[in-house]
């Protein structure tokens, strides 16, 4: 994803991240190592505000003084269906540098089976291109895997992916779906160092990524 779909969802009185000071904020455990340090540093939010997010919208609905994390393609739709008026703030609109849904692989695998890794990456990018052009076959498989998924939810999600060009926008227009840039990765790395999520003495930036494989694939939207 060139545009990270992660968001914070607030009740309609909240217009900015700064307005969330003093609110209860529901976030998942993994978020403490990703976007939460960035939000704390940039907007003055605190750990004292945090409560566990259980992927259930009811605690948010029941507490008008609360905020919850979500994906732009998911929770806002559920809240809309429940008749709850909200404001949705998307991190990528405010300078959060991270990509989303990256492909991770052991360094040894890349070194010893690069052709296999490249084929997997190409198939993944071609899959996204095919899905966005014609979501119907993919949606049938999604509904088989998740009996609670509806056509309406899927249509909403695909609509948001296309409207905001989350996968096909930005550098992907020129360099292909799934492209990554060293400068943007460095911004994410620096953020993690600043937040003490990683120790630069133990994790060398250059060892954390390669642009070689995706650069040669170039599946244009």
Q: For each of these PLM feature ranges, what is it?
A:
Residues 14, 45, 84, 148-149, ...:
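Helix N-cap/coil-helix junction residues
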